[in-house]
Curated annotation (Swiss-Prot):
One of its GO terms (molecular function) is mismatched DNA binding. Belongs to the DNA mismatch repair MutS family. It holds the Pfam family MutS_II. Keywords: ATP-binding, DNA damage, DNA repair, DNA-binding, Nucleotide-binding. Coiled coil: none annotated. This protein is involved in the repair of mismatches in DNA. It is possible that it carries out the mismatch recognition step. This protein has a weak ATPase activity. This is DNA mismatch repair protein MutS 1. The gene is mutS1.
Amino acid sequence: MTEATGIVGEFLTLKEGTDADLLAMQCGDFYEFFAEDAEIVADELDLKVSQKSSHGSSYPMAGVPVDDLTPYVSALVERGYRVAIADQHETENGHAREITRVVTPGTHLETGDESAQYLAAVVREASRDSGDTYGIAATDVTTGQFQVTQLDDADAGEALTELYTFGPAEILPGPELRNDDEFLDRLRERTDAALTLHDSASFEPGRASHTVREQFGSETVDSVGIGDQNVAVRAAGAVLSYVEDTGVGTLAAVTRLQAYGERDHVDLDATTQRNLELTETMQGDSSGSLFDTIDHTVTAAGGRLLQQWLQRPRRNRAELQRRQSCVAALSEAAMARERIRETLSDAYDLERLAARATSGSADARDLRAVQETLALLGQVADAVTETERLAESPLADALDGADREAADSLAAELDSALVADPPGTVRQGGLFKRGHDDDLDEIIDEHEAALEWLETLPDREKERTGITHLSVDRNKTDGYYIQVGKSETDAVPEKYQHIKTLKNSKRYTTPELDEKERDVLRLEERRHDMEYEHFQRLRARVAEHATLLQDVGRTLAELDAFASLAVHAVENDWARPAVVDGNELSIEAGRHPVVEQTTEFVPNDLYMDDDRQFLIVTGPNMSGKSTYMRQAALITLLAQVGSFVPARSATVGLVDGIFTRVGALDELAQGRSTFMVEMQELSNILHSATEESLVILDEVGRGTATFDGISIAWAATEYIVNSIQSKTLFATHYHELTALGEELPTVENVHVAVDGEPRSAGSDGDVTFLRTVRDGPTDRSYGVHVADLAGVPEPVVDRSQAVLDRLRDDKAIEIRGSEQNDGGTTQAVFDLDSGQFRDGAAQSGGAAAGSTAEPVATDGDPEHAPGEAAAEGPKGDERAASLDSETEAVLSELTELDVNETPPVELMAKVQEWQAELDDE
Ligand code: ADP
Ligand code: MG
């Protein structure tokens, strides 16, 4: 068949011209996939493959009916494919087909998912002096949101964090990032986004700037301050051009350019978001996350907003107080709150409806949903004004954010146009009420009259003919007909013309019926066309109001989010925290917001300020150290969301960032060594945290040998205390670190108290702990203590203690303070053996020195450290005398080997080699 050749050929040509993964090409009433595409689609979607022959070869073919395309495409896109759609249209000489739309993960309008769906672009430029500048733009085509930011002098980590926070479905890397494998790898580690190489030209500054100004207007671009942010503009331009190219048709709904800077938000890196389990648990479940726990929103948009708040806590005190006041008012006005939530639960997703109206995919039911939701604004506004507690709160202002008059008038317009319960298809009439348009009314009247005539025809005919089994119906082949039961066919009047005989009946028509049929068909077609035209006009009216819809949608979403926070606060007895400037963090009877849901939680206090900047948290395993620290981080975070917090009372000094290093179990799965990851994260914290940050370190150093670990933990503590000065909580099982708490002025020890007489939890003999946090360090040998409590035999416990003492033998560490604070570098020297301080530069020498054996090394006098000398062992020449030449050789190789420069595998090989050499003797 030559026609077949044509179709497959055309398919392959179109496919060549697109970089989409799959092509669906319209062929009459079907969309067809051919060749390889057919096989992929059939596999993914369980479609049947048939064969299409062309040029003597045969091609696999799979198709879906035109009306069913959307769900199939959605399913493919959700599996990560980019699907091009070629529509067919009539031309003078037959059909022509062209690609009208490419549906991609980031431009997928018919998503079944309520959460935000971001398409992001990221670009990088090397800046003159130091570091790089990253520009990121992200849009959600389903809601018209558009956000841009520029990160100056940033390392890739900050850009990756931004992208992680958006969780985009699709990312367009700029031309300069496409070959940066390291960046791309790290990107893939953090997101599941599809990476798409969009036309490089659209990233060019001139072109991008033009695109952005066209979209938002030059004034807007300048007023939000991205006009001179070249890098941000490049990302924004690329995103807009991609949305345009894919043909999703929602650009008109993208009306608001939101530019945000680094100073607006609390810095939360990807690790911290994961560690604090903000939106999903470490295991990757959304249930059990902070969001899942506190989310009581009743609308999809409200849920999206609340989630966004959690991921982007704020630093602006006025904004936080505004939010708190709204939550406070709603938590007190219980009746009004429930009335508002009840009302909101009828709301549809206005932001998404705006995008559907703009893209031309909204049907009459969607416009009805718009109308019904717009009408809710008035209802909730009434609930606010009628309730004194709410009326005097900032909620009243929040509601003014949306133009109520415009909303009412659009709602009224839609209400007077559309019938109450319109059909799901827009091409078959029945959409409009009478009175919408005179000409339309006339056609509707005529049409209905004709239908009425047909409807009453059976009764008239029965009466006239006396036939009882008579009906009038319609089908595709016969048109309208009169059907008479077999037993009564003898009685039919003469003018009945027989058209068909069935088993139990005969069908007839009459000249009159034929004429009415022609009328009805003509009127029907006319009516459908007219209604469709009017509908398109009405939909365009709604699209013109996209901004209004978004405003109202966001106002309702905000109200929903506030009400949700209020519900959670009331139900869980949370308190409104004081948000203040400065470094205070005080929490009275604080709880962990997620753990308190499932456990009888033992509340704890926390106090930190300038003089108590760094807390070392000690206590046995499973005593609650990690929980206590996360609780501090989550309470700070919630306070900076504007929420109430799980505590009797709290004062939270606003932070610029929260950094955590908690647990390591999940990282093993990624094939990176736990310790490497631990150190990378520590490194990131030490680079990024400032004196306004909150840092949570949980068991840092645990991933390596004990003394290695202590050393790193020790040095990191000194560095944070002396150089960074962030508010820090450090849980450690290295009891040695508590020495720092006793010596450095801003470092304090707290411990989770272990009950002397352990309470037995039930009959299984589990040891339970008190979990109360108190000042001071924990019992130094709690590990052994726990072994004892758990009933390990006495000889083992005793021996453990002895071994521990031996291990700590003869070790001493000096403690460093900062120059300006302490007038000297060395603060004290801690003897790990005795658990006592020896001498130190800043210590008042005499008494302390007298109580211990000898003075040990300080910074000022490193050469003559007696400890070191002792550790060196026998002097060189003595050693030479007692060693054979092989051993000498091994030793000298060992001395020369640069451990840091030698790959671990080589190191192992070396060690084996040496062992073999030494064995030979
Ligand atoms: P650690 O870090 O000291 O090993 P965790 O913080 O992991 O201990 O806590 C151990 C267990 O105790 C967890 O199951 C946690 O839910 C529970 N827990 C911790 N703190 C409390 C508390 N204050 N009240 C009740 N249960 C707690
Ligand atoms: Mg822990």
